[in-house]
Amino acid sequence: MKIAIISDTHDNVPNLEKALAWMKDNNIGQLIHCGDLCAPAILAAVLAPNFAGPIHMVFGNVEDRELTLKKAEDFPRVRHYGDAGETEIAGKKMAFVHFPEKAKELAASGRYDFVFYGHTHQPWEETIEQTRLVNPGTLAGLFSKATFAVYDTATDKLELKILEQLL
């Protein structure tokens, strides 16, 4: 199964739509959003209607928490975890948060195969103990190119996708 990891969308609807179209064409089965989607209306109008699989989300630092949770309840495939989430997909334990400090703590715990995070808008990967710590960058393209990551559970391969190169 292929899993897309995105973060820091910051209401950039055109980039989100392009990424979602690519995900559909490339059989992405699940999506993890590491925060800063921003406007709750983006969840209801763009993200949830245009992604067929499960969507796992956490808060960033610029969301309307109450309204975002309310919108998420309208979509059975959307699970909002609050500030930190964890799931297991194809035998891989994954945690996801927005802030790098919390992500490093989770990675150091040794409980996860992957910890995903956002906030810095910079793609990054490192290994702490046996945990791969990954920042997919910013889908909005703020301060760097618009990027997201894809993890393939069948091949154990993680790739950074640069949005402008996919079009």
Predicted regions and their residues:
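Generic ordered-secondary-structure signal
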Residues: M1, A45-V46, V62, K70-E73, ...
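Conserved histidine-centered catalytic loops in small-molecule metabolism enzymes
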Residues: L167
